Amino acid sequence: MQPTLAPAPHPSMQTSAQDHADQVLHDQLLAAHQHLSHPQQARPQGPTAQPPHMQPNTTSPRDQNNIDPAISGAAMLSGPPQTPPQPEPTGQESPKTYGKRPLSTSKRAAQNRAAQRAFRQRKESYIRKLEEQVKEFDNTNETMKQLQAENYQLREYIINLQSRLLDSQGEVPELPGNIDLNQPRNDISVPPPGAPAATGPAPGPGGAPQQMQVPNPGAATNEDMNSLNRIAVAGLGMRKHPNEEANFLGNNFQARRPRNDDGQPDGSEATKTEPGHGLPVVS
């Protein structure tokens, strides 16, 4: 018994199946192209219902009997439509992590720049402070050197003053400018001892001769000169040598004048005494 062959499919049916396969292939290529052009927009989605034209060709066994074996074999060989391999998504956190890293890096870089700027400012301020301290130290050093030099000068001046003071303690004070000791002194003229100092009236008869004392102008002149000599000696602050004073007194004055025959001293005679200081005093 020979098996009965299925009737040949109608040509219109073959054309429709071919168009359906072309449409499915075209949709698959278009979807793959869109997926490659927009990879970031791809999100894992659950299985969704495919449109009717993209669903696999599932026919009942009764319909398969009516399909041409050539067409059915090509369809079976082609198998279900396969989508091109899609890149596996790294997860939903990968875009967020990728978006956060540049932000974190920028913040860290900004913090580093701020820290470096603050460090430079502190370094510059510290350097300026050190420079000011160095200037103050230099000024203080110069002042100290000046004070040290002035101290040395004052020490030398004090030593010089001390040496001069020691030398001047044993010296005689200087004379005034209007006095010259080298100039010879003029001796005072005194009347000779034999000359009568004054003339008295003639003695009356029967009575002792009486002599009246008359002021002697020579004695007053001697007193004035002696006073001037004492003032000059006191002003000079120097004591005369005793021999010189004795010679001066011996040349200018006489100790006593001879008495008259009557035993009465002459009226012009002046009694002179020498005190302990060596200056003549007229009484």
From Swiss-Prot:
Q: Where is there biased composition of kind Pro residues?
A: 1-10
Residue ranges for the region (Leucine-zipper) are 130-161
Q: Where are the transmembrane segments?
A: none
Q: Does the keyword S-adenosyl-L-methionine apply?
A: no
Give the UniProt subcellular location, in the record's own words.
Nucleus
Bias (Low complexity) occurs at: 26-42, 108-118
Q: What is the protein name for this chain?
A: Putative transcription factor kapC
Classification from the root reads: Eukaryota, Fungi, Dikarya, Ascomycota, Pezizomycotina
